[in-house]
């Protein structure tokens, strides 16, 4: 634990001058005519209906081994998105040695949210032009569009236009991700669907019907958890670091998505590997995973933002909700507020 603490203390901090120059794009949208992708409608409809049936089977006939297996796979796929596609390959918040990259690529294939290369390109674009027409899942268009609707229609022309301006050279030249992209169909088909179905059947005698539909439930549930970061975490929650943007702090999303719901912080400081001011907590399992990998020697150059810069940014652009205190005499309590507080039946000195 001492080594882990030392690792966290040695993470890089961002210069104050850099933090002050960050300007976020204001949310906006313009009217558009949607061009629907009907094959996606059919695919998503079947997958969600089958997943609901899988949920029913979880409570009626599935073996406990299958449920435990699916629970473990869910967290593995979560890590493949949060630690792999998101914090490592999109935002470069830390560096990973080859064994960790391979593990995260396999976990990412288990999640099947396109290839990691495509995921990173769209997510970099999302941050660069957040909640505008150049954002693939523009939350200014509402909950449904930012949750799943954006996958059911053709991309906005601005997404295609500005997507070409995003530097993706590091991701395109990553040999692990090039391998995933080259063999995407057999790799993802095997890791995400075939093995999660075959293992329960042949290892503990689960029925084919249960194994397949519960595998789909695990996949669709994980998919919607990620979608909630794009939708719910851009609509509901407080904004302690920048009140001018849509991303907000959403504890429920953080719980489900292994720490990805501290979204107002993340959009202000996307280079922080913790994605939260208080990254080391039970809601942020991804940070704990990265810290463990750093202790193990597989992750290094973990980047974080200094406490002073966080406080300065919150004071300058936040909605005031960062000043949470435990009560009277908390060291963070505003002195002016304290001096002007009403005190009834005050004891006379």
UniProtKB/Swiss-Prot annotation:
UniProt-listed Enzyme Commission number(s): 1.14.19.5
Key word Iron present: yes
Annotated CDD domains: Delta9-FADS-like
Keywords: Endoplasmic reticulum, Fatty acid biosynthesis, Fatty acid metabolism, Iron, Lipid biosynthesis, Lipid metabolism, Membrane, Metal-binding, Oxidoreductase, Transmembrane, Transmembrane helix
UniProt-listed GO biological process terms: unsaturated fatty acid biosynthetic process
Broad class of the protein's primary localization: endoplasmic reticulum
Top enzyme class: oxidoreductase
Cellular component annotations (GO), alphabetically ordered: endoplasmic reticulum membrane
Motif interval(s): Histidine box-3: 263-267
Motif placement: Histidine box-1: 86-91
Tissue spec: Adult female pheromone gland. Increases by two or three orders of magnitude during the first 2 days after adult eclosion.
Gene Ontology molecular function, alphabetical: acyl-CoA 11-(Z)-desaturase activity; iron ion binding; stearoyl-CoA 9-desaturase activity
Transmembrane segments: 41-61, 66-86, 184-204, 282-302
Membrane topology: Multi-pass membrane protein
Catalytic activity line of the entry: an 11,12-saturated fatty acyl-CoA + 2 Fe(II)-[cytochrome b5] + O2 + 2 H(+) = an (11Z)-Delta(11)-fatty acyl-CoA + 2 Fe(III)-[cytochrome b5] + 2 H2O
Cofactor requirements of the protein: Fe cation
Motif annotated as Histidine box-2, chain positions: 123-127
Localization: Endoplasmic reticulum membrane
Functional summary from the UniProt entry: Catalyzes the formation of Delta(11) fatty acyl precursors in the pheromone gland.
Domain notes from UniProt: The histidine box domains may contain the active site and/or be involved in metal ion binding.
Entry's family note: Belongs to the fatty acid desaturase type 1 family.
Protein name: Acyl-CoA Delta(11) desaturase
Organism: Trichoplusia ni (Cabbage looper)
